[in-house]
Amino acid sequence: MAKEKFERSKPHVNVGTIGHVDHGKTTLTAAISHVLTKTYGGEAKDFAQIDNAPEERERGITINTSHIEYDTPTRHYAHVDCPGHADYVKNMITGAAQMDGAILVVASTDGPMPQTREHILLSRQVGVPFIIVFMNKCDMVDDEELLELVEMEVRELLSEYDFPGDDLPVIQGSALKALEGEPEWEAKILELAEALDSYIPEPERAIDGAFILPIEDVFSISGRGTVVTGRVERGIVKVGDEVEIVGIKDTTKTTCTGVEMFRKLLDEGRAGENCGVLLRGTKRDEVERGQVLAQPGSITPHTQFESEVYVLSKEEGGRHTPFFKGYRPQFYFRTTDVTGTIELPEGVEMVMPGDNIKMVVTLICPIAMDEGLRFAIREGGRTVGAGVVAKIIA
């Protein structure tokens, strides 16, 4: 069967469902698919198709995730749903499914539960920028006051983790009833879709961001100077642009005097392209793999940060034994490994394979980083963990 042409005309937004086990995340995902395809066309996915999430591997970590797509009149959405709590943790930490916004599902029969809190905390740590709340199973609650109470509780919980709890949209509905085709509950799903459209801003495309290129290789070309190669992560670099070399050593400034791709000279290199950038007056030994080339002032080097980390289980090829404070692995950022030490939260003596944990990392040399940067934890080239920079300390 021929693949359908990907519709490029509408803005593309990535979302996902989060929340406590059995609160109805997958049912809601199916309901959104059902109601939006019924209203705006497309192909609906049913509960069983979504629930039977295929296994994926991201950086050697096994994650079960379901991907579905749906449209509103103005946007195209890619939506991820995970069957198990561990899958959410891994998904959010590895950034396997980057979310521009999340739909937090809370059963109004239960109110916020332990995983509700944990998913909100994870969203904060990994930088999910926007959360919309869907209060599910409202058909099972007769008492208006009880619904108000649950809504208040959820809003307070979100505020506790620095989300705008008082202002974000909360929709009260029933995923199951909408899936069964009851008009009053289907209307709530359309209300949720409108909230997605209006509350989650259009994500910035990679090409519109500040230029950054993680350096993979350095060559010296006689008579021309030094060329660094790598894939442009975001932004555009043009011939004549001033750039900074950031990380590992002191930051230096230079000028891009040429861009080449597949041995051809270009005027610019754009996000997603593998290219070589010729640097004016830079010596071969002044720049190395692991540094980044960036728009001046857009990124700074750091050595200490708070992170959220998932430790691979033995089955995923991770460690077979726990680690303790004083653990000194390598932290792999973009293109290079840097040794670092860890500080565990108070009261935590050891970390078991398969755990997720908040830890403070101190690197032996600075790396160009922003909050939200992903990294791997390695021992002798073998990945034993995945993490994300939650907060820069120094």
Swiss-Prot record:
It comes from the Bacteria. Keywords: Cytoplasm, Elongation factor, GTP-binding, Hydrolase, Magnesium, Metal-binding, Nucleotide-binding, Protein biosynthesis. Residues 10-204 form the tr-type G domain. It holds the Pfam family GTP_EFTU_D2. GO terms for molecular function: GTP binding; GTPase activity; guanosine tetraphosphate binding; translation elongation factor activity. GTP hydrolase that promotes the GTP-dependent binding of aminoacyl-tRNA to the A-site of ribosomes during protein biosynthesis. This is Elongation factor Tu 1.
